[in-house]
Amino acid sequence: MGRYTGPTCRLCRREGMKLYLKGDKCYTDKCPFARRGYAPGQHGQEKKKLTNYGMQLREKQKLKRYYGVLERQFERLYEEAERMKGITGENLLQLLERRLDNVVFRLGFAASRPQARQLVSHGHIEVNGKKVDIPSFLVKPGDVISVREKSRSMELIKNNLEVSRNVPDWLELNKDAFEGRVVSLPRREHIDLPIQEHLIVELYSK
C-alpha cells in the first residue's frame, strides 16, 4: 500500500488523537481535530464498541500514522524489535523514535514529521558531517544531526527553530550551530504518546 495522500486532518479524527501532521496549525485553535474530535463521515459521532482485534488494529494504525511509516516498514521494525533484548513494545517505540525524520522533528528543525521527512529526502540534513537522505536511517547515541551549511539560510528551518518546543531528554540541541546530538537511547518515559503498545504485540503474536 502506498503513502496516504488525502486530507491529513481526517487521519487525526479517524484515530481519535492529534498526530501533528500539519506542523504549527496542530498547536492552534484552527486545528480541525480541536473543533471536531470525532471520526470523519456520516456516522463519525456514533460511539462504536470495538472488538479486541479492532482495538489492536486501531493501535497499530495509530502508531503507523503518527510516525508516517508504511506497512512493510512497520513490519520490519517490529521484527527487529522482537529480536532485541527487553520488552518488544517498548523496543518498537524506541526504533520509531530513532528514525532520522523523527529526530529532525524532535530537534525542531521541522514543524512536523512529514516536513522533516521532506528535509531529509531533499538532502538538507547531515549525520556526523555526512549527508544522509534516508528518512528511516536509525540514529544512535553519540550521533550529531545537523542542518547542512548551504541549507541553514532556509527561512523554513530558521522559523521552525524560533518556535519554542520541548526537546526530549535523550536529545541535545544547539540552535546556534543548527545541530543536535543523541545523548542516549530513548526510553518509554521519554515518549509522550498515548499508545497501548502491548495491544500491537498481541496483534502480531496471533
Swiss-Prot record:
Residues 98-158 form the S4 RNA-binding domain. Keywords: Ribonucleoprotein, Ribosomal protein, RNA-binding, rRNA-binding. GO terms for cellular component: small ribosomal subunit. InterPro entries: Ribosomal_uS4, Ribosomal_uS4_bac-type, Ribosomal_uS4_CS, Ribosomal_uS4_N, S4_RNA-bd, S4_RNA-bd_sf. CDD domains: S4. Pfam families: Ribosomal_S4, S4. The keyword Phosphoprotein does not apply. One of its GO terms (molecular function) is structural constituent of ribosome. GO terms for biological process: ribosomal small subunit biogenesis; translation. Part of the 30S ribosomal subunit. Contacts protein S5. The interaction surface between S4 and S5 is involved in control of translational fidelity. Belongs to the universal ribosomal protein uS4 family. One of the primary rRNA binding proteins, it binds directly to 16S rRNA where it nucleates assembly of the body of the 30S subunit. With S5 and S12 plays an important role in translational accuracy. NCBIfam families: PRK05327.1, rpsD_bact. This is Small ribosomal subunit protein uS4.
